[in-house]
Amino acid sequence: MRRLSIVLSCLMALWVTVAHADDKLTGTEISDNNSVWIGLDLGSPHVITKVGWAPSVESQVLSRVVLGVFEGANRPDFMDALPLYMIEEKAMNNKMTYADVNCSRGFRYVRFVKPAGAYQNLAGLEFYGHRGEGNDSHFYQITNLPTVSIHTLNDEIPYDKVHEIVSQLTIISENGTKLLSEPGSIRERGNYSRNFDKKPYRIKFDEKQHVLDAPAKAKKWTLINNYGDKTLMRNLLAFELSRRLGMPYTPYGTAVDVLLNGEYKGCYQLCDQIQVHKNRVNITEMTIHDNEGSALTGGYFIEIDAYADQEKSWFKSVKGNPVTIKSPDEDSITTNQRNYIRSHFNKMEDDPHQYIDKNTFLRHFLVGELSGNTDTYWSVYMYKQRDDDTMFTGPVWDFDLAFDNDNRTYPVCNKKDFIYRSGGSCTGNLKKIVDEFVIRSDESQSLMLDIWDKARHADLTEESLVAYIDQMEAELDHSQQLNFLRWPILNKKVHQNPQALGSFQAEVENVRRFMKERLKWMDKRLGYTFVPTGITEVSAESSESSIDLTQPYDVYSVSGQPSGHSLEGLRPSIYILRQGHATRKMIIR
């Protein structure tokens, strides 16, 4: 084994050692012009089995190497790089620290990428391994979560929502045994969330890909930054509520660790891009030729969006609602198509009961209220099928401020009315539409209670939701530790945080508490009594006038909605029986 002495531009001595089981090789020093990384060209591929590092004595701060990343590549520009190891603990003073590498592929080029905000301050850097191409049997995965590693051409950093930067997009999963690595691009995404130091991204593969266990094979995917959500799970929990409340389509989402050009960015949520797709928003995708007759009627995908005026393809409705046209695409939509959907939206505003699908609107409403989401009507997706005048609502989206995470509405459960009626929680004229469609409609009230009742007797229970939160807390534990090393905000209020609880565990417990309280609050606000299933006895409470159950009678829910003329087939709940002037309360268990 021979030791290389490498002199950096900053005149700091760096020793780089490459050990080989048979041949003892030396490499050529390589580095970038900005001192972001240093490494070696080994001349030929080598399987790296161990790395070692030591901070310089001058650095004084041994934690400056924490979150530094080792990478291997077979292109000198590192576009095809894969992670070898990430440092998670402080180094020892004046001593080398070593770590085994669990990656079976051989690499010609190896490097160490300094953590964000630190100087390149290593006194010693060592690589161990053996010559060979290796194989693709296993790769390094940062935590139990999938690792998303993105490398851009010339290390360019995404800087806006318009310019797509050429990239290699890599996802390592299933404990390092599965690799997806394909060319694509990256740009920023989002609206207000782009203001945070931890940026949100949209990634796009050149060809459609099956990503992890997502239903859709697609090019476009999102990386949600969850910066103001210190549980890192609010969006995922809301998606779970969407599934349990029966929304036709709930976006796919899963937690991942993200690297960009070798720099650790934190824990993100990899999610569907909300778009027209057979496994996403499943409507007819229009072409520029769909300009008349049946073809002109759809499909359309729109977003009632407070930020619509920042988009290229948008309009303001007669009643003042800002609407972004998501599909047809802004670059291909025709004048006829734009005029048609604008006219149809205005008709919907004038007569929501004729045009809005109650089933999806009410389920969407319940998800927003159960989660206590201030932003529910700040951004609402809707879609229209071809040859159908109905406007459907969904999918749900954007829950960073939900579950008691907004100082403007905290504590949500202390409010007597629904969260959407809080000041500033609706864009445009949406509050009036929701009032008319939900609150003032007996038909909507009855259907909403039926939806709620079915969900409460399925898996929308306190026990199952708490179990889901517990599961997510365990799955996120390793990743959250690294995330809050990168972004030390647990003791700070960021965005609209009403409080800073100091730890991930305390933040999760706050969501767990809220979920329990909110279920009870919703039951009460909806006039609903949850009666567990599994008990067959019937108890009764009568008025002074008795009811003869052998004679005709009417059945009502406790909120006064008609429920038929027989107790047979009714779900467990409390009902009011009326026969002439006589009434009787029945509890079906």
Where are these regions (language model features)?
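C-terminal outer-membrane/trafficking sorting elements
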Residues: 534-589
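Positively charged n-region of N-terminal signal peptides that target proteins for export
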Residues: 1-4, 589
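Internal "kinase-insert"/substrate-recognition segments embedded within catalytic cores
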Residues: 209-210, 225-226, 246-251, 263-366, ...
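Middle-to-C-terminal accessory/interaction subdomains
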Residues: 158, 182-184, 192, 196-197, ...
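Aromatic, loop-rich ligand-recognition surfaces of beta-strand-rich domains
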Residues: 22-82, 95-136
